[in-house]
């Protein structure tokens, strides 16, 4: 059964938060009681994603395996490919008071991201994001709902003519979202603060082999389509051969406290954002575990507000946001929802799904 959406408002925020944290408390014996770092013991993590179930990405001990596509018959309802990524992280930078202006949480992989990848690709309940379909919306536990049409977040078949993009905010160093989800979109832009980008680029390049369904071009990563060796007297380029479609993948600095898309002069500072507008008909903004203290909430929501206005008015894009939260502080979660709904006037849906409710995470769809 597909997930449902609970439309939150200024009254149901508190009911939702109370219920979710009550569920969490009831599962305290089953769930890890930690801050959510995927693995704080190692500098290099080996993680496997495969369609055998939601296992959160099994960690390997520095044994590198390359991507191998499953022999299971292709099914657009769930992904069938397996992915194996190597993530270099920096525990020392996480605890540093000097690195990246003392904003250091992005130097390690947090568990929200692997959980989201597993759920999106392999959970049957996440099918609306893979197929593009109507989803039932309720306005509360006892309220009869309506249906909301969702565009595809990812296209497993490659047959959809629509051009879709993903803009990732607060990517951190791992780079696993672009190299996995990049297989199923046309444009992917991964952003974070400037001090994070070099390690993010390194991890993307390390795992570029996981882009098995796409040819990747990137200005920021200096990737161009290769030229095929001449055959006989003919010069044949890769672009002229029938093969994989192309992914535009970019890595860019985006400071939530400094972005100003209302000033047209600053648009030239963000060519990667313009790339999404110029190449896509729909965009999902993805932000995993970026709301963990109250000081980040306003800059994040202001950035979303600007992006929504600019991409919709300038390029007429379908605009949706997926926010993943590791449920730590109940006060921070409540404040985020209050500000998003009441102060910034976003439409916010809780994604109601059993797999998610049995975890320490929650996902919100924002429009």
Curated annotation (Swiss-Prot):
Entry EC no(s): 2.1.1.-
Gene Ontology MF: a single term: S-adenosylmethionine-dependent methyltransferase activity
Entry keyword set: Methyltransferase, S-adenosyl-L-methionine, Transferase
Keyword Transport tagged: no
Any one biological process term the GO annotation gives: methylation
Superkingdom of origin organism: Eukaryota
Residue stretches of biased makeup (Basic residues): 58-68
Residues annotated as binding S-adenosyl-L-methionine: 110, 170-172, 192, 256, 288
Transmembrane segments: none
GO cellular component terms given for this protein: cytosol; protein-containing complex
Region annotation Disordered: where it falls in the sequence: 55-74
Family note: Belongs to the class I-like SAM-binding methyltransferase superfamily. RKM5 family.
Function: S-adenosyl-L-methionine-dependent protein-lysine N-methyltransferase that monomethylates 60S ribosomal protein L1 (RPL1A and RPL1B) at 'Lys-46'.
Name of the featured protein: Ribosomal lysine N-methyltransferase 5
């Amino acid at each position: 059964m597909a997930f449902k959406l609970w439309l939150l408002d200024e009254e149901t925020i508190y009911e939702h938060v109370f219920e979710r944290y009550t569920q969490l408390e009831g599962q305290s014996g089953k769930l890890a009681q930690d801050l959510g770092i995927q693995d704080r013991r190692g500098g290099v993590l080996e993680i496997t994603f495969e369609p055998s179930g939601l296992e959160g990405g099994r960690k390997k001990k520095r044994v590198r395996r390359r991507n191998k596509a499953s022999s299971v018959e292709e099914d657009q309802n769930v992904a069938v490919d397996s992915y194996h990524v190597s993530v270099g992280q920096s525990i020392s930078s996480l605890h540093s008071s000097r690195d990246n202006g003392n904003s250091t949480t992005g130097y390690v992989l947090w568990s929200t991201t692997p959980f989201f990848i597993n759920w999106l690709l392999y959970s049957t309940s996440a099918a609306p994001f893979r197929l593009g379909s109507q989803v039932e919306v309720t306005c509360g536990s006892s309220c009869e709902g309506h249906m909301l049409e969702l565009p595809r977040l990812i296209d497993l078949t490659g047959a959809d003519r629509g051009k879709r993009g993903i803009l990732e905010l607060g990517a951190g160093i791992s780079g696993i979202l672009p190299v996995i989800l990049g297989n199923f979109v046309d444009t992917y832009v991964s952003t974070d603060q400037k001090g994070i980008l070099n390690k993010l680029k390194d991890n993307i390049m390390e795992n570029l082999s996981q882009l098995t369904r796409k040819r990747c071009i990137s200005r920021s990563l200096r990737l161009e389509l290769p030229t095929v060796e001449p055959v006989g007297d003919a010069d044949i380029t890769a672009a002229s051969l029938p093969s994989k479609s192309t992914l535009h993948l970019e890595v860019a600095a985006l400071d939530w406290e400094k972005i100003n898309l209302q000033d047209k002069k600053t648009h030239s500072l963000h060519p990667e954002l313009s790339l999404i507008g110029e190449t896509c008909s729909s965009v999902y903004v993805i932000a995993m575990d970026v709301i963990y203290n109250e000081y980040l909430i306003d800059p994040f929501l202001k950035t979303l507000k600007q992006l929504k206005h600019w991409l919709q008015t300038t390029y007429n894009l379908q605009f949706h946001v997926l926010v993943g939260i590791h449920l730590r502080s109940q006060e921070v979660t409540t404040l985020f929802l209050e500000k998003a709904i009441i102060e910034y006037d976003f439409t916010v849906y809780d994604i109601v799904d059993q797999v998610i409710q049995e975890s320490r995470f929650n996902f919100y769809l924002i429009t």
